[in-house]
Amino acid sequence: MTAPTREVLLLDDDRWDRVLLATKGEAAACYQCGTCTATCPWGLVAGPSIGVRSVMRRAQLGIDGWAEAVWRCTTCGACEEHCPHEVPISDVMLGLRSLAWEERSVPQGLSGVLWDMHWDGNPWGRPPSARSAWANGLDIPRFDATKHSVLLYVGCTASYDRRGQKIARAVVSVLRAAGISFGTLGDEEPCCGDPARSLGNEEYFKRIAQANSHKLAAERATEVVTVSPHCYDTFTHYPGIGEAFRVRHYSQLLRDLVAEGKVSFAGVEPTKVTFHDPCYLARHHDETEAPRTIMAAIPGVSIEEMERSREETLCCGGGGGRMWMETLPEDRFATSRAREAAGTGASYLVTTCPHCISCLEDGASVAGARNLKVMDLAELAVLAGIGAAAPTEASR
């Protein structure tokens, strides 16, 4: 009788040392409760789950078996939100990816993304000379610290992706309506480095961050406002970020303008909207109220919350470098999200992230949610007739 085949686990102390170094020691903090696996959105779709606890355990033991799983992670942070030991699991995953680069265990095509960044300054492989083509006809000035209070950082997706370009143009309309003096870097705008960081190539990201820090210092920018939450998050990982310049997502700036009574909205016909919180605002930066403050200020808008909202948001599936990897239709979180949004009876599914917009529009199409329109908050603000508020007696 043949004995059953069993997996033999060979512990590798040398590899464990490299795991510790790559994850800055955080991989050792996991004590295997399994909460991470239970809350991972991969458990909601047809494909195999990541098995986060298993990845962490194999990493702790220095054994193989985690390489494929770490590339499925969207770094959404759902696991971290519920981890009783507060292990920074997303950072551990990025650390393991950095080790995978060293061991050349990287999915096909990802090195090409980084080479596009190296040669063309963007992960889309588009020419730098076309970076500001999205702004044709808008007459946006080149940023000048003596004239402008805000440097608008557009980002690669909003610069090159056709749908993202519409978002960038809407943000420009919002800033102009609010009376904000701003400029951009035009074709000189560099990639923030998000793809390098999210794909785990830490050394390349550090070089990008250093070069960009020098460039922004030379521009004498004191406030940088981003179109994408991913760019916003990436800038916060630059060394000395708070000392050099302030960085905000555009929704945070608009929230402050609304709260200060500096902008108002003409309003819309009575409309139900629901909001999808981007992971890189809601979980990574605890920012959930800014968009709701803005929408609540628009006459005619009624906010219908989805069950999974704010810090409990469901990832769209586009983070953690997954925008550059293929996901089977049955494994796309955004399809479930679109169905959830349609179930609220809302006419508009609003969000504040170009990656989320791309995934959710695809999800709405697959889900057959024909009556649900996906739009960015800046587009809703323009639709609602944003403008500078009329001065009150107290402000005259």
Model-predicted segments: where are they?
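Ferredoxin-type iron-sulfur electron-transfer modules in oxidoreductases and energy-metabolism complexes
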Residues: A3-K24, V45-R72, C76-A78, E86-D120, ...
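Iron-sulfur-cluster electron-transfer modules
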Residues: R18, K24-A27, L44, M56-V227, ...
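The −1 position to Zn-ligating cysteines in a subset of zinc-ribbon hairpins
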Residues: A29-Q32, C36-T39, R72, A78-H82, ...
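Hydrophobic scaffolds flanking metal-cofactor catalytic centers in soluble metalloenzymes
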Residues: A29-T35, T39-Q60, A67-E68, G164, ...
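Cys/His-rich zinc-coordinating "finger/knuckle" motifs
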Residues: T37-G43, G47-P48, E80-E86, S90, ...
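Cofactor-cradling patches in redox/metallo enzymes
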Residues: S159-H249, Y280-A297, S302-R396
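C-terminal amphipathic alpha-helical segment
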Residues: A259-M295
